[in-house]
């Protein structure tokens, strides 16, 4: 099957065997029903064993799966009356970041997220989900608008990182990211950030200064990709698997380190297996988080966000 991952090979081989037996059973006089049922039970156990013991590298592969749901996929299922807004009012519109206004269970909100492409043409249009400065500035424009009108902000994070090209640097890539961090820290409305795939470095942080941060179970969040870390540490990008295991990039790691506030369960095998079921899990998390944060005053939201990020990286105090 296309787009299947290395660690899933035993599952795919058993599924193929079951499919062959079912096809043979339909045209043969021999009844193989019992054998098929036994193999299906074995398949269920095998899937549970493999998917419940995934390594950091396995999860990294799932986070980058080409069929993994994107921001727009979730927006279509989670929000009503979504109206996309375009442009940073300074240079142009960046398709690597989408955003606009919508309602969530009757509550007016602003939704912003990285957007990867679905195929080669779409990925070129979206720059593979790697924003230029105008993408971050568009996001900030929408956040300031939300802050002005008292709309909670919901961010979906899914990027390898900010685009490192020359044009992006000339237009102030680092300043655009830093400006978002600075401005988000002082927003008077609730901010919820959810890592739905890959949370790569500053490109992810530019949408990540939230009152609460959540990660999907198989999402990853790191300052550099495992391939990049391996190239720096061992001068060998093929050591990416080794790097992934030592970098603590998984949802479990980030929650244990106190960087995120919760883990959103994924359907067995990854979010791409059942978009509707995965959207429902995200729905539950947003509902609970929004209910809690909307009880805070403006001053409490700013203070809570400040205290949250001040504690990150603190291991001991005098």
From Swiss-Prot:
GO terms for cellular component: acetyl-CoA carboxylase complex. InterPro entries: Acetyl_CoA_COase_a_su (IPR001095), ClpP/crotonase-like_dom_sf (IPR029045), COA_CT_C (IPR011763). It is found in: Cytoplasm. Keywords: ATP-binding, Cytoplasm, Fatty acid biosynthesis, Fatty acid metabolism, Lipid biosynthesis, Lipid metabolism, Nucleotide-binding, Transferase. One of its GO terms (biological process) is malonyl-CoA biosynthetic process. Transmembrane segments: none annotated. Acetyl-CoA carboxylase is a heterohexamer composed of biotin carboxyl carrier protein (AccB), biotin carboxylase (AccC) and two subunits each of ACCase subunit alpha (AccA) and ACCase subunit beta (AccD). Belongs to the AccA family. This is Acetyl-coenzyme A carboxylase carboxyl transferase subunit alpha.
